[in-house]
Amino acid sequence: MYGIEYTTFLIYLISIILFNYILKSITRMMDYIIYKFLLIVTIASIVVNAQNYGINLPITGSMDASYVNATKDKPFLTSTLCLYYPTEARTEINDNEWTSTLSQLFLTKGWPTGSVYFKEYDDIATFSVDPQLYCDYNIVLMRYNSSLELDMSELANLILNEWLCNPMDITLYYYQQNGQANKWIAMGQSCTIKVCPLNTQTLGIGCQTTNTRTFEEVATAEKLVITDVVDGVNHKLDVTTATCTIRNCKKLGPRENVAVIQVGGADILDITSDPTTAPQTERMMRINWKKWWQVFYTIVDYVNQIVQAMSKRSRSLNSAAFYYRV
């Protein structure tokens, strides 16, 4: 009897000792893993020169007063820069080697030959139909034209922000906008958009749903339209679908790898007053109009200051990708 009790006691004692040994082994192993992980993180944080994406620096106003002409210490050896300019710039310069000249000048600012691409567009309206922003950094030059202020403002709003878009079937469904970030964006050769707000009984408010001539016209024969209507109210739409495509879009936030430079004009276009723009600063600036050579020289001088206010983390943009997610 006593032998059985002693045996049971020994079994319990051995089990406790074995369990304690296993627990200590696991503890030592976990300590080793944790210490090794912390060591790797510490070394990586010292070696890696990470970029802070949380800062969106304003670069509005005149460059002559706000920026210092200097070359960035670390050239962008692995980055690409696209410079978009209107056809009138090439026409005025009238020099077949002008892009080569500018490439050599960009080299003095730390941009290797072949890293800067020159992209030409016909005019603001045409560019807005098919914007293609593929480089790590994209600088868009827009010559100010008082008759095109709306087009310039809408194009800037489009390319300076990221949008999540879905198709709209206006023949079958009514649509409403939910929140200030929700817009209807239309692109095409000719976009005419009419809307008819509806009450809770789906009857037109000031219009007849069966007669599009009574609808409220919000855009006429435009190539790019960002439509904003009263939130929370269903609308029936009439769109020239043969020459225009409309999407239901939500503004996600700033597209940080794009900057817009307004060339000339008394005042800079201000899209920051839009309540959907957060933070209330954008990568827009103005430089005084003289000659296109002078404009490009100014860009070369300040290119690194411009890029420092940007981030190359944003997605590329073209019209096809824009319709689904940009």
Curated annotation (Swiss-Prot):
UniProt keyword Electron transport, yes or no: no
Entry comment on modification after translation: N-glycosylated.
Glycan attachment sites: N69, N145
Subcellular localization, as worded in the UniProt entry: Virion; Host endoplasmic reticulum lumen
Binding site for Ca(2+) 1: D95, G206, T214, E216
GO CC list: host cell endoplasmic reticulum lumen; T=13 icosahedral viral capsid; viral outer capsid
Region feature (LVD motif): 237-239
Annotated signal peptide: 1-50
Keywords: Calcium, Capsid protein, Disulfide bond, Glycoprotein, Host endoplasmic reticulum, Host-virus interaction, Metal-binding, Outer capsid protein, Signal, T=13 icosahedral capsid protein, Virion
Top-level taxon of origin: Viruses
Spans annotated as GPR motif: 253-255
Any Pfam family hit: VP7
InterPro entries: VP7, VP7_1, VP7_2
Protein residues bound to Ca(2+) 2: Q177, D228, V229, D231, D301
Alphabetized GO MF terms: metal ion binding
Disulfide-bonded cysteines: C82-C135, C165-C249, C191-C244, C196-C207
Region (CNP motif): 165-167
Chief location of this protein within or outside the cell: virion
Family affiliation: Belongs to the rotavirus VP7 family.
Function, as annotated: Calcium-binding protein that interacts with rotavirus cell receptors once the initial attachment by VP4 has been achieved. Rotavirus attachment and entry into the host cell probably involves multiple sequential contacts between the outer capsid proteins VP4 and VP7, and the cell receptors. Following entry into the host cell, low intracellular or intravesicular Ca(2+) concentration probably causes the calcium-stabilized VP7 trimers to dissociate from the virion. This step is probably necessary for the membrane-disrupting entry step and the release of VP4, which is locked onto the virion by VP7.
Miscellaneous note of the record: Some rotavirus strains are neuraminidase-sensitive and require sialic acid to attach to the cell surface. Some rotavirus strains are integrin-dependent. Some rotavirus strains depend on ganglioside for their entry into the host cell. Hsp70 also seems to be involved in the entry of some strains. In group A rotaviruses, VP7 defines the G serotype.
The protein's assembly and partners: Homotrimer; disulfide-linked. 2 Ca(2+) ions bound at each subunit interface in the trimer hold the trimer together. Interacts with the intermediate capsid protein VP6. Interacts with the outer capsid protein VP5*.
Protein's name according to its UniProt entry: Outer capsid glycoprotein VP7
